[in-house]
Amino acid sequence: IDVCLTGSQKAIAAPPGISPISVSAKAKKFMIENPPPTHYFNLARYFKYYDEEKHTPFTPALPLLYAYREALSIMLEEGLQNVFNRHKVCSDALYSGLSAIGLTPFAKEEDRSISIVALNYLDGLEDKTFRSTLADKFKVLVAGGFGNLKGKVFRVGCMGEVSPYHVMRTISAISSTLAMMGYDTDAAAGLKTAEEKLKDI
């Protein structure tokens, strides 16, 4: 991998606004020899300042850097393997619990993401109404689908500080919202199924 980048707000759970980037020696050499004519995305300029002064070419967002460092410290304190395990177990619990209340995951089991749980909408369930009811009544936010999946799926984030509390609360809120909208769901089955999975944390 020559270039790898992410967002600070993803599984690291820091505020958004920082994009950590890792660049191989080969990619760095290429970028220095072929700098872009723009100010933005000009990593060659960043390399020069960092290599010579350990500084950035422009004013850095220091509060975000402090928050990012603290988020990394929290991860290291928990232990990376524990962080990975917590994400995996919570994801499994969400998939299993939401399936038990009558929803179906969008992807086949072998293709599913751990960090984003995508589920198909039940027949007749309107995307905006469902998501706004879930947010207004239970303060649980989920995202809709993109492109040809818009209105067909919704996505539940399972990353960062996700915990058994978040899993159980999300399953309960989704089940209650579906019931409010006239769908027959089995919240107790969903919560019991998820609780069994969460014993692995």
Predicted regions and their residues:
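Short beta-strand-to-loop capping motifs
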Residues: V23, L119-D123, G160
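Conserved active-site segment immediately N-terminal to the catalytic lysine
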Residues: I1-Q9
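Solvent-exposed alpha-helices and their adjacent loops that cap or buttress functional pockets
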Residues: A11-P15, E109-D111, L134, G147-N148
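Active-site C-terminal subdomain of aminotransferase-like
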Residues: A11-S96, A100, I201
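Flexible, glycine/charged-enriched surface loops at secondary-structure junctions
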Residues: E78-R86, A100-E109, G145-F146, M181-K192
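PLP-dependent enzyme catalytic core of the Aspartate aminotransferase-like
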Residues: N148, K152-I201
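Conserved PLP-binding catalytic core of the aspartate aminotransferase-like
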Residues: T104-K137
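A common structural junction motif
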Residues: L134-V142, S176-M181
